[in-house]
Amino acid sequence: MLSAQLKTYLAEMNMSATELQQKQLIGFVEMLDKWNKAYNLTAVRDPEQMLIRHVMDSLTVSPYLEGQRFIDVGTGPGLPGIPLAIMNPDKQFVLLDSLGKRIRFQKQVQFELKINNITSVESRVEAYIPEIKFDGVLSRAFASIQDMLSWCHHLPTEKGTFYALKGQLNQQELQEMPTGFSLVETIVLHVPMLDEQRHLLKIAKQ
């Protein structure tokens, strides 16, 4: 059932995935559903909704990633980082979260599904100092752009990009962009079977 739905949704998004990638994406949903019963990793309880609201929602960002090294801050159970890593095996992803149960889940996903381009780190974002800075900083967890840029400003390279996944846009928030940052592009995202607003904001250092 999930496999057929995934194929349909990928076709709607004009995305192609190998059989292995499709198995990994479905495997991630199945593991999230299983672990969620004990560890409360997400408020979404239904696997079909997990596929739409977590996996497909994450994958809408994939065509816009520029560079090779990315960090997903406040990743939770690995969103959007794990689906993006599955679909972009040539890129490297660091998944950052401060809760140990989420990191344990991510590491089990990596082990069982054999995903080799992910590094999970248990840390608060402001305390994490990377040895090498990132081409992209991803987040769909932060309530405000100001918080994201304030806490993550030290993570990207000088030419790196912040990718903020948002629902409905807050125009006042966009107008109050912190000093030293500029909005490069606002992209309207379309998630199959989801009648809710989704936007990707690309922000750069000035």
Curated annotation (Swiss-Prot):
It catalyses: guanosine(527) in 16S rRNA + S-adenosyl-L-methionine = N(7)-methylguanosine(527) in 16S rRNA + S-adenosyl-L-homocysteine. One of its GO terms (molecular function) is rRNA (guanine-N7-)-methyltransferase activity. Transmembrane segments: none annotated. InterPro entries: rRNA_ssu_MeTfrase_G, SAM-dependent_MTases_sf. One of its GO terms (cellular component) is cytosol. Specifically methylates the N7 position of guanine in position 527 of 16S rRNA. This is Ribosomal RNA small subunit methyltransferase G.
